[in-house]
């Protein structure tokens, strides 16, 4: 007999795979002058406060657009150097959402923080748009480390990394081999390869071959100039339609809360929730758990106690056998997406990050 849990997971998987379009309908671009869409976001740069500096650089010849967050006491003329942290955004997200929120909060703690749009996404370059290869996302994180290392005010011996959702999985993967990362943390980690391969909650393992066949067909279409997309946000939906779709799903679940966050409360035109179907060919060969033992840096994994994605954090954490300093920190009452924006949960995560980076950077 199929369990209710797996039936729900299969329904969620059908939702994720059922929408093939590049974007949802946004009323208008973000009104914040920096495009930021989170609560308490910087609206102007002022002396004596955290400042934001949009920057561009290249990774493997492709333009990367990023926001650099500078602490309130930042002074290029002083002799002081600063610890720094890279922040990798979730799958389908952008630097102006939760990644920007946590980067700003880290800057408030005295870190130089950087959040970039993954290549092929957001304001970064790369064609076709919304290609989602794990190798690209991992290199984007090392690329942020590269950029920070060029800044004279950054202490290169004190660079850490934070990854959120899918960015958390890719940050763990980057830290496995990039030892310039001295302390690594994840928030609501999402193992992208495992989910694309096995289905959410491992509920559709038998469907893996069909997904790979669909990816192969999409690659053939790309050769003819047609790009095929997957995504969890119904294309061109009104707010009312998005709310109706949410009502079909249980509360405090990843995809229900994801529709609310990305489609309604924190939507941004660069955060479409979509990726090229052809990307499955690379995604399904990836699993962050494969080499977790290579992480020898201090490791902090944060997740919501009620998150339906918690199993991914727990399984990866259990395989991190190469570090003597690791901690799994669960936020009581929090689901996956709620760690992105609910003040109570964000504050708990930030306080834990303050303790962690304060000790190891």
Q: Which positions does each model-derived feature cover?
A:
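The serine-hydrolase catalytic nucleophile loop
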Residues: 92-104, 118, 313
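Short beta-strand/loop motif that positions the catalytic acidic residue
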Residues: 295, 301-303
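Alpha/beta-hydrolase active-site loop
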Residues: 131-152
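Conserved alpha/beta-hydrolase
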Residues: 105-125
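Alpha/beta-hydrolase-fold enzymes
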Residues: 172-259
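N-terminal cap/lid segment of alpha/beta-hydrolase-fold proteins
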Residues: 30-80
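Short beta-strand element of the alpha/beta-hydrolase
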Residues: 79-90
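Catalytic histidine-centered segment of alpha/beta-hydrolase-like enzymes
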Residues: 334-346
